[in-house]
């Protein structure tokens, strides 16, 4: 019985091997392996580039470009950080809405009215305000337009300032809002 060997390009009795260039080309042309290989090569090259940049202390790029978040965990951390920022912003807006509800009810709580006076004390001096002390300001424009009975309770237990600020707050706020509106 005779055994015949299929001879390839190289001849001889050894089996023919595929050339490495052909294997790489075949892998590069197939869709999923090529995508995986391209992604891995990009990750390796970018990490190598960033490592070389960081070790040689080259400061041509800003510091935020020295690290590129390529992992899913870092993406989750960035997303959660953005969610936390949005939640804190919505909490601030909710607090502002609560302050607005308190103002609209015109409550006579002395704690809230002292907080409102501190808010007024932080505003810059405007022509409509008379500075009495660091925590007390009186509206001189609108005080003359009110009835005397409205301020009769000012001399009570709540002190001189409690009802007057809450009585004038909405009107004064409207005057200040018109002045600060850029449009």
From Swiss-Prot:
Domain of life: Eukaryota
Protein name: Putative uncharacterized protein encoded by LINC02915
């Amino acid at each position: 019985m005779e055994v015949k060997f299929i001879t390839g390009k190289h001849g001889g009795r050894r089996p023919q091997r595929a050339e490495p260039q052909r294997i790489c080309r075949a892998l590069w042309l197939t869709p999923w392996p090529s995508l995986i290989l391209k992604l891995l090569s990009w990750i390796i090259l970018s990490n190598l580039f960033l490592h070389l940049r960081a070790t040689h202390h080259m400061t041509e790029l800003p510091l935020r470009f020295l690290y590129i978040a390529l992992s899913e965990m870092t993406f989750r951390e960035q997303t959660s950080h953005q969610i936390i920022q949005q939640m804190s912003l919505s909490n601030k807006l909710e607090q502002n809405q609560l302050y607005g509800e308190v103002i609209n009810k015109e409550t006579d709580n002395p704690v809230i009215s002292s907080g409102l006076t501190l808010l007024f004390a932080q505003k810059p001096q405007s022509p409509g305000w008379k500075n009495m002390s660091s925590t007390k300001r009186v509206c001189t424009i609108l005080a003359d337009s009110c009835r005397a009975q409205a301020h009769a309770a000012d001399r009570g237990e709540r002190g001189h300032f409690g009802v007057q600020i809450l009585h004038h707050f909405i009107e004064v706020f409207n005057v200040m809002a018109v002045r600060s509106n850029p449009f």
